[in-house]
């Protein structure tokens, strides 16, 4: 029998911030959020201590403020003369003394720091499991196939899981939640649903196990369905319209005879190929293995960039934002020695009220004359596409740029499928462009070297100094958040 681990670093960003301040992540009330984006900003992480006061994992900052104020109203009623003796961010102190005002820390995100911690923790994983048996699912979550290693741990995956997590705690101060399963799906569900509610040990470690039999016993009637991996609110609502509210309902539907109104055929009619996955998961079955994940190769590759603007931008202002994004992505192509053949744009407009009827946005794709990494060629194509799709008299709140059909520059010649009718013109075009493109590539490479040494804002275009430009700000960000 195979065994898999799903490991989730508990409240990762918040835990890192606590550790950096020599604080206990399980005791301190702390939120990671960028307060410069107003109280509507989404909190990237909340410590377990603060969650214990009824605050969710990814609330908006104003929701934290409201819940804390609500809790303090209740606590104040119990205090002598309805006055707090003091305040505290410590769960232990707040539990011990109900006359203390509930307080919490709000700290800005530091994405590069979290990446560094994640890399350190990955090195801990490698002490126990080979890289070919690890799949990095996100910055704070991994899957492992631990089957080949269990002979060293009394054939007990729980012992191995406990050993790994205790090493992480001792090395970094960060704890984790672990799901153990006989397939990848069961490991993930054991972690997401069972382990997070299981009693913790002295290090805050929670571990849960599922096989197909236990899954059907413990989770077949669990609600809501959105707690299960790969079932979002949209799928859950569509299942509810069919009268399916639990995994047991889906399994029963899959086993129904053809003459019944609700059967497997009805599921496939509603969900297409997705129904196969729903039915498998209803029975706790997952056919995907770690080897299949490692051997998977996407037919098409792409790179993209997207940003939500902090206010409604005019068309001219948005045009600059779009060019900056294309420049940044083209520099990534040069850095990684890649080329692209297609470019797409997506714009989301600012809503103007119910009384004004207008489209939600615009999008389009343009094919390039040839595979390229040239910023000039890509900006020219993007500008042409922008002019084609933009509506007059609109304001824009979101811009997305994507390069499609991305492949190594070394394969560029092999990728060109030339016909008898375009060979001559393309050859003439290439003769006039080769040296120009080579100069541009050398310049871009030199600029990348300067930015690597002195920072991304070491060299900027003059347009990036305009007050509505976002280039400087985004150069100080990773994934849309401060480095």
Task: Put a short name on every predicted segment.
Residues 1-283, 290, 426-483:
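Gly/Gly-Pro- and Ser/Thr-rich, intrinsically disordered tail segments characteristic of DNA damage-repair
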Residues 6, 227, 235-395:
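DNA-contacting surface of Y-family translesion DNA polymerases
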Residues 182-185, 280-283, 339-350, 395-407, ...:
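A glycine-rich phosphate-binding loop feature that marks nucleotide/adenosyl-phosphate handling sites
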Residues 384, 388-449:
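C-terminal hydrophobic structural anchor segments
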């Amino acid at each position: 029998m195979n065994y898999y681990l799903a490991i989730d670093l508990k409240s990762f960003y918040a835990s890192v911030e606590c550790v950096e301040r020599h604080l206990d992540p399980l005791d301190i009330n702390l939120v990671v959020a960028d307060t410069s984006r107003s109280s509507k900003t989404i909190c990237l992480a909340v410590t377990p201590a603060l969650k214990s006061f009824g605050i969710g994992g990814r609330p908006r900052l104003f929701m934290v403020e409201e819940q804390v104020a609500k809790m303090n109203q209740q606590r104040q009623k119990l205090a002598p003369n309805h006055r707090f003796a003091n305040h505290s961010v410590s769960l232990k102190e707040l539990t011990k003394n109900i006359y203390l005002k509930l307080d919490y820390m709000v700290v800005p995100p530091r994405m590069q720091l979290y990446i560094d911690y994640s890399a350190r923790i990955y090195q801990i994983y490698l002490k126990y499991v080979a890289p070919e048996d690890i799949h990095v699912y996100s910055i704070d979550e991994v899957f492992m196939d631990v089957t080949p290693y269990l002979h060293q741990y009394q054939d007990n995956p729980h012992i191995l899981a406990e050993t790994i997590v205790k090493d992480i705690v001792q090395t970094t101060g960060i704890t984790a939640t672990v799901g153990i399963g006989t397939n990848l799906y069961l490991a993930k569900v054991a972690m997401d649903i069972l382990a997070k509610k299981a009693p913790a040990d002295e290090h805050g470690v929670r571990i849960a196990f599922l096989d197909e039999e236990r899954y059907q016993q413990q989770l077949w009637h669990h609600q809501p369905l959105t707690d299960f991996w790969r079932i979002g609110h949209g799928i859950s609502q569509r299942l509810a319209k069919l009268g399916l509210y639990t995994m047991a309902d889906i399994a029963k539907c899959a086993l129904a005879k053809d003459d019944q109104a609700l059967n497997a055929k009805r599921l496939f009619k509603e969900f297409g190929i997705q129904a196969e996955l729903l039915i498998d998961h209803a029975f706790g079955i997952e056919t995907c293995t770690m080897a299949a994940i490692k051997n998977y190769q996407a037919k098409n590759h792409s790179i993209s960039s997207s940003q939500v603007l902090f206010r409604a931008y005019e068309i001219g202002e948005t045009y600059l934002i779009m060019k900056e994004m294309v420049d940044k992505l083209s520099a990534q192509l040069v850095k990684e020695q890649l080329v692209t053949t297609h470019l797409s744009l997506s714009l989301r407009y600012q809503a103007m009220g119910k009384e004004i009827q207008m489209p939600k946005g615009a999008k389009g794709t343009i094919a390039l004359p040839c595979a390229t990494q040239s910023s000039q060629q890509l900006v020219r194509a993007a500008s042409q596409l922008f002019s084609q799709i933009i509506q007059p008299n609109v304001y824009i709140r979101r811009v997305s740029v994507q390069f499609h059909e991305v492949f190594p520059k070394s394969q560029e010649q092999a990728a060109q499928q030339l016909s008898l009718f375009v060979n001559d013109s393309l050859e003439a075009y290439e003769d006039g462009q080769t040296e120009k493109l080579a100069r541009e590539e050398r310049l871009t490479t030199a600029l990348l070297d300067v930015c690597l040494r002195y920072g991304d804002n070491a060299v900027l275009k003059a347009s990036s100094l305009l007050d509505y430009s976002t280039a400087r700000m985004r150069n100080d960000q990773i994934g849309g958040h401060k480095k």
